[in-house]
Amino acid sequence: MIYEGKAITVKALESGIVELKFDLKGESVNKFNRLTLNELRQAVDAIKADASVKGVIVSSGKDVFIVGADITEFVDNFKLPEAELVAGNLEANRIFSDFEDLEVPTVAAINGIALGGGLEMCLAADYRIMSSSAKIGLPEVKLGIYPGFGGTVRLPRLIGSDNAIEWIAAGKENRAEDALKVGAVDAVVAPELLQAGALDLIKRAISGELDHKAKRQPKLEKLKLNAIEQMMAFETAKGFVAGQAGPNYPAPVEAIKTIQKAANFGRDKALEVEAAGFAKLARTSVAESLIGLFLNDQELKRKAKAHDEIAHDVKQAAVLGAGIMGGGIAYQSAVKGTPILMKDIREEAIQLGLNEASKLLGKRVEKGRLTPAKMAEALNAIRPTLSYGDFGNVDIVVEAVVENPKVKQAVLAEVEGQVKEDAILASNTSTISINLLAKALKRPENFVGMHFFNPVHMMPLVEVIRGEKSSEVAVATTVAYAKKMGKNPIVVNDCPGFLVNRVLFPYFGGFAKLVSAGVDFVRIDKVMEKFGWPMGPAYLMDVVGIDTGHHGRDVMAEGFPDRMKDDRRSAVDALYEANRLGQKNGKGFYAYETDKRGKPKKVADASVLDVLKPVIFEQREVSDEDIINWMMVPLCLETVRCLEDGIVETAAEADMGLVYGIGFPPFRGGALRYIDSIGVAEFVALADKYADLGPLYHATAKLREMAKNGQRFFN
């Protein structure tokens, strides 16, 4: 054994060939934490000092290669002064460069996944051989940063600037055949042949059949582009990527600028350019928010996994109520491998549900994400029925009938008599109390809420609602089923609107106040879209449905009359009474035409102004900043109340619920991280500034206490 650590070993294989193996003890995956980096330094030095070494194979002792840097450790570094951060990055990069500069040839044998620093380690090797089932990529832009271990330097010099820009700016994982096509790897083999293939490559390099020094040389030199080629490649790419990423996500464009700045330098000087740009990005609020989201997502996954121990396995599911929603749920279950019964009382609803599932599956086939055989398999896993005949073997039933408590109670009571005693019943409701619905059941302990967001196939969140009598097994089984469907479940306690809608309606309340104050709804939409929302509140209300919003507002007003009840008529009342229901009937705040792809296209409609005129009570001067605060303060305060009331257990879950459920701007991190970014004391002062607008703008006593004590939601 040449070197032995807790994350890395270096041992002799044969004829002067050694294997540098990553195998982090006590972890299921390899990652670059401080321990691994320190051991890599020692391992490289040990190889360098051993004259018997003729070649090095880099491998992994786990099912994946290396998943990247351990962000939980490195995030603290991002708060260091910029100069210290640059120095730390350059020190880490010296390790990779020293490995790259070894006198002997090196081969990286990539199994599983090599992401971020994992791929950057491979790029420092002379040759890369990849398992056909492996994937590689540089996903750092998704965290608001860019590759910092030489990725912006080595990748463009290996595969060309155009390909490298595409890989780095998109941040996606790339399959083996795509990696081979662009030259990111030198060979692709079946997983079982990876070790033999790596040995063959290294032997050919040792024998001189392959010239490893010549292979290495382009990575050490400047980019092979003349001035005109550089200008065309980089300026075009910056414009295109800026358009794709938008102004709130600077990392992809900064990555291109860094590649451009370093293009005329050799490796070492280029790495200095990379480190300087990386340090600037790492200290931005966008990086802080996106890294916070990543850590929150990890916490969500841990919490969801904790339910696995007591969850029952769902082998057969059922959905009550077909149509678009039922068809979407059936599709999601079937495509992820759980067969599902789809029941309705009307044949036409069944057909609508089947058409929806078939359409969604067909789109996946068109995009190459599903084979026709797999589509047929998924369709066969959806069994339409007008009766309860096959419900005896069902493990979970998702009720998705009309949003009416009496109808839901009747349907739930009926199905309870048709399923086995330990079957879970879950209501897909957006606003109706789970405790209220449970009153109709003989076994309320087997009942929970399971709130899917529309469209089901696109929205990642599922709220699993725990009622007063819901058992932990019922909650755990529903969480496990949601995960199996490919969703991100968050467990919340019962209250009107649960988490997401309870928080969304105060946001709509702020919008209603703005319209009543004479502010143009088109202007409000533009301001909030610029703030980072995927669509403004008027457009969102049209998409949700004015009737749905009207009903939801009434439910919330009944549940929280102290702050959500407003006796004045609002814009939503006016549109609802005028039968302008949004996209569903072609007119809401906007009018809708069908575009070439058959999708609704928003257009201005002057006639809506006459409809809104009676609900405009004043003409108030309101700045863009005021518009943001009228909307965001009540949303943030209601999120705080949900946390204080125990509706949601952690700040991480609250923020992720809003990002996944209503499209809260990810680069702002969620409502509670947004408060942190302003400062809790400053946010309380902001709320006080708008306190005359009503109780929705009144900070809670606990929040005031946090402000007084200098506390944050995230530390």
From Swiss-Prot:
<comment type="subunit">
    <text>Heterotetramer of two alpha chains (FadB) and two beta chains (FadA).</text>
</comment>
<dbReference type="GO" id="GO:0008692">
    <property type="term" value="F:3-hydroxybutyryl-CoA epimerase activity"/>
</dbReference>
<dbReference type="InterPro" id="IPR006176">
    <property type="entry name" value="3-OHacyl-CoA_DH_NAD-bd"/>
</dbReference>
<feature type="binding site">
    <location>
        <position position="325"/>
    </location>
    <ligand>
        <name>NAD(+)</name>
    </ligand>
</feature>
<comment type="pathway">
    <text>Lipid metabolism; fatty acid beta-oxidation.</text>
</comment>
<feature type="binding site">
    <location>
        <position position="430"/>
    </location>
    <ligand>
        <name>NAD(+)</name>
    </ligand>
</feature>
<dbReference type="GO" id="GO:0004300">
    <property type="term" value="F:enoyl-CoA hydratase activity"/>
</dbReference>
<feature type="binding site">
    <location>
        <position position="660"/>
    </location>
    <ligand>
        <name>substrate</name>
    </ligand>
</feature>
<feature type="binding site">
    <location>
        <position position="408"/>
    </location>
    <ligand>
        <name>NAD(+)</name>
    </ligand>
</feature>
<dbReference type="InterPro" id="IPR012799">
    <property type="entry name" value="FadB"/>
</dbReference>
<keyword id="KW-0413">Isomerase</keyword>
<feature type="site" description="Important for catalytic activity">
    <location>
        <position position="120"/>
    </location>
</feature>
<feature type="region of interest" description="Enoyl-CoA hydratase/isomerase">
    <location>
        <begin position="1"/>
        <end position="190"/>
    </location>
</feature>
<keyword id="KW-0520">NAD</keyword>
<feature type="active site" description="For 3-hydroxyacyl-CoA dehydrogenase activity">
    <location>
        <position position="451"/>
    </location>
</feature>
<dbReference type="InterPro" id="IPR036291">
    <property type="entry name" value="NAD(P)-bd_dom_sf"/>
</dbReference>
<comment type="similarity">
    <text>In the N-terminal section; belongs to the enoyl-CoA hydratase/isomerase family.</text>
</comment>
<dbReference type="InterPro" id="IPR008927">
    <property type="entry name" value="6-PGluconate_DH-like_C_sf"/>
</dbReference>
<dbReference type="InterPro" id="IPR029045">
    <property type="entry name" value="ClpP/crotonase-like_dom_sf"/>
</dbReference>
<dbReference type="GO" id="GO:0004165">
    <property type="term" value="F:delta(3)-delta(2)-enoyl-CoA isomerase activity"/>
</dbReference>
<dbReference type="GO" id="GO:0036125">
    <property type="term" value="C:fatty acid beta-oxidation multienzyme complex"/>
</dbReference>
<keyword id="KW-0443">Lipid metabolism</keyword>
<dbReference type="Pfam" id="PF00378">
    <property type="entry name" value="ECH_1"/>
</dbReference>
<feature type="binding site">
    <location>
        <begin position="401"/>
        <end position="403"/>
    </location>
    <ligand>
        <name>NAD(+)</name>
    </ligand>
</feature>
<keyword id="KW-0456">Lyase</keyword>
<feature type="site" description="Important for catalytic activity">
    <location>
        <position position="140"/>
    </location>
</feature>
<feature type="binding site">
    <location>
        <position position="501"/>
    </location>
    <ligand>
        <name>substrate</name>
    </ligand>
</feature>
<keyword id="KW-0276">Fatty acid metabolism</keyword>
<feature type="binding site">
    <location>
        <position position="454"/>
    </location>
    <ligand>
        <name>NAD(+)</name>
    </ligand>
</feature>
<comment type="similarity">
    <text>In the C-terminal section; belongs to the 3-hydroxyacyl-CoA dehydrogenase family.</text>
</comment>
<comment type="function">
    <text>Involved in the aerobic and anaerobic degradation of long-chain fatty acids via beta-oxidation cycle. Catalyzes the formation of 3-oxoacyl-CoA from enoyl-CoA via L-3-hydroxyacyl-CoA. It can also use D-3-hydroxyacyl-CoA and cis-3-enoyl-CoA as substrate.</text>
</comment>
<protein>
    <recommendedName>
        <fullName>Fatty acid oxidation complex subunit alpha</fullName>
        <ecNumber>4.2.1.17</ecNumber>
        <ecNumber>5.1.2.3</ecNumber>
        <ecNumber>5.3.3.8</ecNumber>
        <ecNumber>1.1.1.35</ecNumber>
    </recommendedName>
</protein>
<dbReference type="InterPro" id="IPR050136">
    <property type="entry name" value="FA_oxidation_alpha_subunit"/>
</dbReference>
<feature type="region of interest" description="3-hydroxyacyl-CoA dehydrogenase">
    <location>
        <begin position="312"/>
        <end position="715"/>
    </location>
</feature>
<dbReference type="GO" id="GO:0070403">
    <property type="term" value="F:NAD+ binding"/>
</dbReference>
<dbReference type="InterPro" id="IPR006108">
    <property type="entry name" value="3HC_DH_C"/>
</dbReference>
<feature type="binding site">
    <location>
        <position position="297"/>
    </location>
    <ligand>
        <name>substrate</name>
    </ligand>
</feature>
<keyword id="KW-0511">Multifunctional enzyme</keyword>
<feature type="binding site">
    <location>
        <position position="344"/>
    </location>
    <ligand>
        <name>NAD(+)</name>
    </ligand>
</feature>
<dbReference type="GO" id="GO:0006635">
    <property type="term" value="P:fatty acid beta-oxidation"/>
</dbReference>
<keyword id="KW-0560">Oxidoreductase</keyword>
<dbReference type="InterPro" id="IPR006180">
    <property type="entry name" value="3-OHacyl-CoA_DH_CS"/>
</dbReference>
